[in-house]
Amino acid sequence: MAVVKVEFAISGKLVNKPRVDDWNPLAKFYYADEALNAVANELDSFDGRRDPERCSQLVNKLRQAQDRLLHIISEMIQQVFPRESDRACRDYRVKFPEEIMHDNLPGQLWFGAEANVIPVFGCTFSCLTAGSNIIDHEVESEAIRPMARALTKHLDTLRDLLKDQSLRDPTHYSDKVKRSLKHFDHLFAEFELNYVSAMVPVKSVREYDCQLDIAVLFSEALDRAVRLDYLTQDQIDDCDPIVMIAVPRLAIVCGLLYFPEGALNVDANPETLSNMFRSFHSLLVKIRDLLRILNLHELRRVEKALCTGETQVKFGEDSIVETLTVANFHLKTTGKGTGRILEAQNLQPNGSSSSNSSDGGDCDVSSASGSVCHTNTFAYKILSPIRLKDSSESSSIENSSKLDLLIMTHPPDPHRLRARFRSSADLIHRLFVCICGVADQLQTNYPTDLRRVLKMILQPNDVVPISGKTAPNPENEEEMGLEVQEALPLPSLIGVRWVPDSDCEQCTACSAQFTLVRRRHHCRNCGRIFCSRCSANSLPLPELGYDRKVRVCNLCFLYKINPFSPCTGQSNSSQNHSVIAFNSAVTSTAVVLNQVDHERSQDGSQSNESPTATTATTI
């Protein structure tokens, strides 16, 4: 009797098994879990020493299966808990390095928690749940091992619950499943934070606040540049390289002049500065002093030169246009003591510095991209009247420290600062060289931080209000089919509302009735339903989250190929015009396709699902 019950239960599960082409998350989870178990069983019974290449392939396949399974679980969590406040907070990800955040991160974390040996983030990970340690991270391993065990244990329980629920009803989530999903979400978030923090350096709260202050400063500088016509809105929209170069330069001017107590507060402790500008503290102080003695006209000329990127700019008829040399900057002063000579060095376009000798004394200065002490020394050689004679590294450090103390205790006289330069053009050229030297080094020394700050101001996140109510299931239905299941990204990003399958019984374009053979196909661009003949084209839609080619209807295909067709000239204020244009386009497309079908039927070569020539117009 017991054997009969077991056989009946097994047969019941086979009967209730979800369809392969079902697009519900629970149905997708069932087959993804089956694929993961198959790969795991094959890997357990495989001797990796006999065929290491095959073993490596199986490990990669296992990682992909784990990653896909976690993406499906994440899709379930977003569907069951649509409000972000109900899910685990993941704001800590802003502290992670940019190269860490990718789509395969969840799978790598799971694999790293229970696999034997795995290279992730350039390190070798050992089995945490089995008691091994991460190489060179023994203390961190002991701290996160309980989290890894709790995560893997709960994940096994969750997989059993989800698989059982998928056999019962793939469209319903029981209260027990919901509680388990929520608990897993919090466990995985906690493990992710501690695991990544142990492997790679992450930003502290103060460092992240400093980065946000820099982003605000860059944003203010960009806004001011647009108001003063230094940059155009078209350049910003197109992410012109000129914008990428000019914004850091203008931000230095804004931070030192207009926001002295902000992100570039050089009067405070240098340790409070962002890591991006900390090594340039002494040079920033001298740039600030020179900027303060400029009049409004000279300041505009400096900012214009920083935007154009031209080292030789014609500022006026009486300005010096020829290349400046060290001899042009020799200025002898008289007084009680020895005369002081200002030595200036011209900075080449590629950032290298040339050394010159004068009055029998030589002083070699390394490139501006060198160490901090050399950078400070180079700054004083340009902007300070004190002459440096020692060329050794120890002497440079000692002299720089003394000069730092001298400048802080005795603020420079504006009249003396201006008297060191022959003309206004000389002063502007010196400022241009120093500001560009600091800003351009950010791209070399801190490329990741600079890229993230520029991304914040050039590609801000749009806040879209979302209702807290869960959308009904028909609106979340997607097209059936294994080929689409493999092509769509997970979690899928749907930017348009799809027409439910139950609301459409015929093709939107040709009005052909859908049957068992003629299937429904959603256009990824407009969300309407078409037959295969009227949606035989594919295009990538990155603005909707589809980086790879996905199915689009013939109408949207031609619109994407030729967006300047006559229908785009319709007035946006009248919806009737667009509706009439769409209906006429659908009618004309249907007539042409029906004529083609009629001709093929006469030749005896018609097929219900044969693709035809693409005929489309704009929506």
UniProtKB/Swiss-Prot annotation:
Gene Ontology, cellular component aspect: early endosome membrane
InterPro entries on file: FYVE_LST2, LST-2, Znf_FYVE, Znf_FYVE-rel, Znf_FYVE_PHD, Znf_RING/FYVE/PHD
Keywords: Metal-binding, Zinc, Zinc-finger
Function recorded in the entry: Negative regulator of epidermal growth factor receptor (EGFR) signaling.
Annotated Pfam families: FYVE (PF01363)
UniProt superkingdom: Eukaryota
Zinc finger (FYVE-type): 501-561
Residues reported to bind Zn(2+) 2: C523, C526, C553, C556
Residues binding Zn(2+) 1: C507, C510, C531, C534
Sequence segments annotated as region (Disordered): 598-619
Xref: CDD domains: FYVE_LST2
Keyword hit for Zinc-finger: yes
Compositional bias (Polar residues): 603-619
Name by which UniProt lists this protein: Lateral signaling target protein 2 homolog
Family membership noted in the UniProt record: Belongs to the lst-2 family.
GO molecular function, one term: zinc ion binding
Bridged cysteine pairs (disulfide): none
